[in-house]
Amino acid sequence: MKAVVLVVVSLLALSSINCDVFFEEKFPDDSWESNWVYSEHPGKEFGKFKLTAGKFFSDPEDDKGLKTSEDARFYALSRKFKPFSNEGKPLVVQFTVKHEQDIDCGGGYLKVFDCKLEQKDMHGETPYEIMFGPDICGPGTKKVHVIFSYKGKNHLIKKDIRCKDDVYTHLYTLIVKPDNTYEVLIDNEKVESGDLEADWDFLPNKKIKDPEAKKPEDWDDKPTIPDPEDKKPEDWDKPEHIPDPDATKPEDWDDEMDGEWEPPMIDNPDYKGVWAPKQIDNPAYKGPWVHPEIDNPEYTPDSNLYKRDEICAVGLDLWQVKSGTIFDDFLITDDPAAAKERGEVIKKRQEGEKKMKSEQDEAEREKEKAEKPDDEEDDEDLDDETGDAAPVEEHDEL
């Protein structure tokens, strides 16, 4: 058994050695302040980040990350690293988000930039390569953004991916592969995958409707027609309303003063509505006409949709109404297995967070109970003694 364990450990170590880690940040100490750059873009009041493990955690040191600290603020913070291209290999972007403030409206996503990023001028309109991560605003928006820049235009994924909306740490992973496929994982579990060309509007449609094709004039696409043999019954036509036969003229009605009395109108019980002949199958029905398609002359395949020619920066460029989100464990690599291995610790972190928060909640309940005024407790005791409960209804036995 020990030999098997050693082999597994050796294989994982070999995987880690062979993979390229282009960027990794775990915020172990205050050194982040010299590595990350705040934007000074004019006209925006940017919020500040603080290094903290938050109010509940698994490890007070290992769980430290950057926390948004000011409500109703834009945030713009970035870091550059050695540039690289993912040509011919996978691209993995991974990080954790902890909305411990129970966020109501705000972003939790990461942007990936090329080297043209001017860090001190970064803002919402700054071009980026990739935008990935959760975004929450009210009950209607709880989604994972996956946006790629292609030929100068940002393209949003056509699928809806739901993000986590609780108060614990969650791991978000984007994997882009050289075969133009992708995967999105949350907490190391695949939540979406597919083909880049199919799930984004990078390219024009392969096929278009033939502009020369026209539906034939004699094409009958009505599945049913009125029955030509059906005839309206002779007694069909009845008025919709009739005078109320039970109504009588009031005794004090004066025809000279009030005019000629007329009984009020009521719905006619014999009224059958507008007659229409019954429908029968159309013998000339040819089915719905399908517009024929042709190859789109504007379509050109691109085998390099996955490729980013240059990546050299990441940034947190977002808005939050209620601050308190903690970002941590940034990783950009070419090895999905190595990223998954690093992500396994997040499950243990969640367990520790839930345990501490549960203890905190219980302590808060005990504190509130202890701080209750004595007269409230006396009233509760009196209620218990007098049996002040809802009356029980008596029922006859069957």
Swiss-Prot record:
Residues 20-197 are annotated as: N-domain. This is Calreticulin. GO terms for cellular component: endoplasmic reticulum lumen; endoplasmic reticulum membrane. Expressed in fat bodies. Not expressed in midgut, silk gland, ovary or testis. Residues 207-251, 337-372 have a biased composition (Basic and acidic residues). Residues 309-398 are annotated as: C-domain. Residues 191-255 are annotated as: 4 X approximate repeats.
